């Protein structure tokens, strides 16, 4: 049986300053979906974000990019669930994950914030960890823990390199494919495909 997916939220920070950064890969996925499907996002004050919808009937999907900044994403998600009369299990959050290499995806039905402020805010506002999230690997700035801490902010708020762009494109394609699979397949079956996705960067000479 297909999942009851009704709302997809991409996490990120608003404004041109953050466009295309690693932290905004959730936004990038929804923007690509809009470009390919021919719809545009509009500011919805009551939802604290840019919203759109696609599909009809049982395949209708609400889309949201919170404009609250990452650390307050949960406020927009709570507002959207309330406005559309949805439950947390009908939600999918697209979120960057520094603990996953670029080129990997992880679908989970629930879980902790894992140090991600956008997920932390969402858990706080929903009052539960039980909502699906698709973690999109962006890679870590360093393997050494101390160096990683120092470079985390500049890493997540920085752009993808030219070498990484083909991988980013493949990842975004896979995210959109994964969303379609979640609409047609069970969570477990879609998750098997999503979690098995792998795109390796070409080695640099």
UniProtKB/Swiss-Prot annotation:
One of its GO terms (biological process) is rescue of stalled ribosome. TRNA binds at residues 18, 69, 71, 117. One of its GO terms (molecular function) is peptidyl-tRNA hydrolase activity. It is found in: Cytoplasm. It comes from the Bacteria. It is an enzyme of class 3 (hydrolase). It catalyses: an N-acyl-L-alpha-aminoacyl-tRNA + H2O = an N-acyl-L-amino acid + a tRNA + H(+). Its EC number is 3.1.1.29. SUPFAM superfamilies: Peptidyl-tRNA hydrolase-like (SSF53178). The record marks 13 as: Discriminates between blocked and unblocked aminoacyl-tRNA. The keyword Hydrolase applies. GO terms for cellular component: cytoplasm. The record marks 96 as: Stabilizes the basic form of H active site to accept a proton. The active site is at residue 23. Keywords: Cytoplasm, Hydrolase, RNA-binding, tRNA-binding. Monomer. Belongs to the PTH family. Hydrolyzes ribosome-free peptidyl-tRNAs (with 1 or more amino acids incorporated), which drop off the ribosome during protein synthesis, or as a result of ribosome stalling. This is Peptidyl-tRNA hydrolase. It comes from Synechococcus sp. (strain CC9605). The gene is pth.
């Amino acid at each position: 049986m297909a999942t009851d997916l009704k709302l997809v939220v991409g996490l990120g920070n608003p404004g041109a300053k953050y466009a295309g950064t690693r932290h905004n890969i959730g936004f990038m996925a929804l923007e690509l979906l809009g470009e390919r499907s021919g719809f545009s996002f509009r500011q919805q004050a009551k939802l604290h974000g840019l919203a759109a919808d696609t599909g009809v009937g049982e395949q209708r999907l609400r889309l949201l990019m919170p404009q609250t900044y990452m650390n307050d994403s949960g406020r927009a998600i709570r507002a959207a669930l309330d406005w559309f009369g949805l439950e947390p299990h009908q939600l999918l959050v697209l979120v960057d994950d520094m603990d996953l290499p670029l080129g990997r995806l992880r679908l989970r039905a629930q879980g902790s914030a894992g140090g991600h402020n956008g997920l932390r805010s969402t858990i706080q506002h929903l009052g539960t960890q039980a909502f699906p999230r698709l973690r999109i690997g962006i890679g870590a700035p360093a393997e050494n823990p101390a160096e990683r801490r120092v470079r985390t902010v500049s890493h997540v708020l920085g752009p993808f390199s030219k070498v990484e762009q083909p991988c980013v494109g493949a990842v975004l394609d896979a995210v959109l494919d994964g969303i379609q699979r979640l609409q047609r397949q069970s969570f477990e079956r879609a998750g098997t495909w999503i979690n098995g996705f792998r795109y390796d960067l070409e080695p640099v000479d």
